[in-house]
C-alpha cells in the first residue's frame, strides 16, 4: 500500500490504537523552554515521578532572556523566575540545558536542528506552537500544551488522533528577491489561516527542493499559521548534508544505518492526499502582511484592499477591524507605508542564511537606517549563529548602518521580554504572527522576509527588494 511521508512517520510511532482512532504515539525528542515547562515539572514533583527518558529531552531559555548585555542578569522578576526555575528543574532531573550564558543558547527551534537533536524520522514535541519548524527534516513535529509536556516527561508518549494529508506543491523557480518566507506567506494568503485545519502539510515541488534547510525550516515553521498540525519536507541529500557532523547526529556505523532509513522518508509515487494546493514559484513576489492575521497578505506591488469590495459580511467586518487597528487606508500602496521599527530575528528567520540575506541588502544599499526608523534590531537565533555572523563580518555591516546587534533570544517576536513595540508603533518584522498586540500592546506588525525588513529599515518604508540592483 502506497503511503505519504506523514503516513510513514505516523505508522512508525504508533504504540497502540483505540477503535475510535485515538493512538498512543511514541515521542523521540522533547524540547523544553522556560515558559511552558514549570507546571509540567511541578506535576512530576507532586506525583513523585521521574523523567522517563532523560536523554530524550533538551532545554534552553529563550522567550524571556534579555538580548542586551546579560552581565546584569534579568531585570523583570517574572522573567527571572521562569528562567531560574528551568535551570533548577533541569539540574534536579539531569536534563541537558543550554543556560543563558552558554554559547549554544538560543531559540529552541534554532538550537535543536543546529545541534543535530532534530533528526529525520523522529517525532519531536515542544510546548510551543512553532515546533512544526522541525518538520523540515522529515520529522513529525508539533506543539503541545503544558499538561502534555508533563505526560511526555513521565511516559515518553502522547495520545492523539491522526491528521489528514495535504500536499502543497510549489513548482518552478523563485525570482531573485523572493524567499521561503514569501512562499509560505503566499500559501497562507491562498488557503487562509484555517485552510490547513485538521491536516499535516507536506511541502513539495521543484521550488521546495531548491531551498536550503534554513528555507525549509521557515516554511514548516509557519505551517501552523495555516492552521495545520504540522509541516513536512521529505528527506534528500540537502537534509543529510546539513545533519552530518553535528553533536547529536549519529556517527560511524550508526550513521550508515540511519541513512538507510532516512532515505525511505518520502511520499510514495502513487500515494493519495486528501487535499492538494498548487502554486507557481515564479509568480510569488515578495510578500507583506497588511492586517492582523497572516492571511491578510499581498505582494509588495499591490495596494491595501478595500473592504467595500468584499461580498462576505464576516470577511468585510474583519478587514474593517484590521484596517482600523493597523491605521491603514484602503487603496494605499504597500510601498508607501512608513515604519517605526524593524525586527530581524525569531524562530522563523534568525539563522545564518537569514542574517546573510539581510546584511547583503544593507551592504548593497550602502546607507544608514532611515531617520524615521527609531530602532532596527538584528537578533541572531543562537550564540553559534551570532558567532558565525561575526566571523563573516556581518555584524559590522549592520552596526555601521545603525542597526543594533543583539544577543540571541525570541526578542521582539512576542511581548514577553524587554524588546517590544509601544502603542501605535509600526514594525517590519521577520517573525510569524501579526496578531493585535503580539509585539506589544497597540503595536502594528507587518510580516516580511529578512531582505524586505532590511530594505525597509534603510529606506524607511517598504520597498520591492527585486528592484535593488
Swiss-Prot record:
Membrane-spanning segments: none
Annotated GO biological process: L-leucine biosynthetic process
Domain of life: Bacteria
Keyword Lyase: yes
Pathway stated in the Swiss-Prot or TrEMBL entry: Amino-acid biosynthesis; L-leucine biosynthesis; L-leucine from 3-methyl-2-oxobutanoate: step 2/4
Chain residues that bind [4Fe-4S] cluster: 347, 410, 413
Database matches in CDD domains: IPMI
A GO term, aspect molecular function: 3-isopropylmalate dehydratase activity
Annotated cofactor note: Binds 1 [4Fe-4S] cluster per subunit.
Stored Pfam families: Aconitase
PROSITE patterns in the cross-refs: ACONITASE_1, ACONITASE_2
EC number: 4.2.1.33
Required cofactor names: [4Fe-4S] cluster
Reaction catalysed by this enzyme: (2R,3S)-3-isopropylmalate = (2S)-2-isopropylmalate
Matches recorded under Gene3D superfamilies: Aconitase, domain 3
Keywords on record: 4Fe-4S, Amino-acid biosynthesis, Branched-chain amino acid biosynthesis, Iron, Iron-sulfur, Leucine biosynthesis, Lyase, Metal-binding
Family indicated by similarity: Belongs to the aconitase/IPM isomerase family. LeuC type 1 subfamily.
Stated role: Catalyzes the isomerization between 2-isopropylmalate and 3-isopropylmalate, via the formation of 2-isopropylmaleate.
Subunit structure: Heterodimer of LeuC and LeuD.
NCBIfam families: leuC, PRK05478.1, PRK12466.1
UniProt-recorded name of the protein: 3-isopropylmalate dehydratase large subunit
Organism: Polynucleobacter asymbioticus (strain DSM 18221 / CIP 109841 / QLW-P1DMWA-1) (Polynucleobacter necessarius subsp. asymbioticus)
